UniProtKB/Swiss-Prot annotation:
PROSITE patterns: ATP_GRASP (PS50975). Its EC number is 6.3.4.23. It comes from Methanosarcina acetivorans (strain ATCC 35395 / DSM 2834 / JCM 12185 / C2A). It comes from the Archaea. This is 5-formaminoimidazole-4-carboxamide-1-(beta)-D-ribofuranosyl 5'-monophosphate synthetase. Keywords: ATP-binding, Ligase, Magnesium, Manganese, Metal-binding, Nucleotide-binding, Purine biosynthesis. Belongs to the phosphohexose mutase family.
Amino acid sequence: MITKQQVLEFLKNYDLENITIATVCSHSSLQIFDGARKEGFRTLGICVGKPPKFYEAFPKAKPDEYLIVDSYSDIMNKVEELRKKNVIIIPHGSFVAYLGTENFAELTVPTFGNRAVLEWESDRDKEREWLLGAGIHMPGKIDDPRDINGPVMVKYDGAKGGKGFFVAKTYEEFDELVDRTQKYTIQEFITGTRYYLHYFYSPIRNEGYTLSEGSLELLSMDRRVESNADEIFRLGSPRELIEAGIRPTYVVTGNVPLVARESLLPLIFSLGERVVEESLGLFGGMIGAFCLETVFTDSLEIKVFEISARIVAGTNLYISGSPYADLIQEDLSTGRRIAQEIKEAVRTNQLDKIIS
């Protein structure tokens, strides 16, 4: 992985009065570009082949310029061009997935956030070590599929938008559905309501909900719309569907907004705080936007089944603010909050604390 010192050497040649915010044209890029523009930054969209036509329909979020590449791996050959434009990369889930975690770790362009989190986020065993070390309640993990004796969720490593995930109740069902060519994790299936909690950790702000270093914000929350799981039971009971050879799938197709009971906010903040504090000790901290993927049970317990250590697509619901972000600042999206962090770091000469 590129070292922090190498990144700081690149920054010495940057014109910090003319930073360009860049990301791949996908996932949450409209929100990122809109937020960057609101904070006065130039924007650059990276795309394969030609610029997406639909960007013309959203002039406020259309980037100021595009970098056209032959393939996403070709980004690695454009690093000097990006650095000449004083680019800071904003990674989102698709950026990392398309470029590949190894390439992303070696990308010689200053990047918002701490790339060291990749080692802990992309490996489900290390992710579990991190969350359990933070005192987070997680679904039980089953190491041997022959021990399955009730509903479990089987997930593959990496950001796949839920593709290929499945529920099994027996070893036989698991054996029928699993793709053994991929690394997988088997988790106890928790009944309850799914909440995806969108946080922002700043190592350079020391006001609001403060931690041992910096501060934590809760910007929004959502629930994912999954195909075909969210509509399939219109066709019949689970038993009838299985008899018909139809099984639920969990591909994310969109998001719906949520708020939580106000009495749950102390626990929600506590979860975010514990995860950040643990990250500070493990790898120097998880910087910027992150999401805890949770289930709220009927006993009002919150179980965390995964973490996404960057901006998530569910924040796209709130380009003009959310019920929580509006109580911090009107018209505050996660994309805009990222731009504010960069702007503040430049102003206070603290870019080294938020860039890797």
